Amino acid sequence: MGLRKLKNIKHGGKTLTEILESHQRFFRGQEGGVRADLTGADISHADLREINLSGAILRNTNFEQSDLRKAKLPGADLSGAKLGKADLRNADLTEAILPGADLSEAQASGIEFFRCDLSNVNFQNAKLRNVNLRLANVHGAKFSGADMGVAILRETDLTGADLSGVDLTTTLMPKGYAGAQAKIKGA
């Protein structure tokens, strides 16, 4: 089964295409624009490549197994969103809000997570190669089994994060990091 098209997905009586057009007008400051609020929407198995949802309200939205490659989501509120097995490669989530989101088994390599709230996010078994987690809040986040090769964790407080089973040999860690801040296999 292929990915669903935007015109075939409805939320609140409107198609996703209509919601996105209105959001683009809002984002540009044009008349008639409305910030996208897709709280609780089912947008799973959808083709959302290069979509611009900057600043959108996406709380508890189901994006499972959707294609979000190169999506623009800076400042978006993805609290509690379901992104398991989604493809988020090279998406921009700068300053996005994701507490409690599920990104388990997501393909999330190359993501910009700069200054994100990633508290209590489930990253278990996710592919997080070349991600930037500088200044992100990762308290309570579960990274166990994730592939974090060449990830940037500089200036990130890892207190309370679960990094068990993660190979950190090529990961750029915070200066002076000793491993006691986070749960690490063998630490």
Residue positions per predicted region:
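Long, contiguous interaction/recruitment modules in multidomain scaffold/adaptor proteins
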Residues: 1-2
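Tandem repeat scaffolds
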Residues: 5-18, 24, 28-187
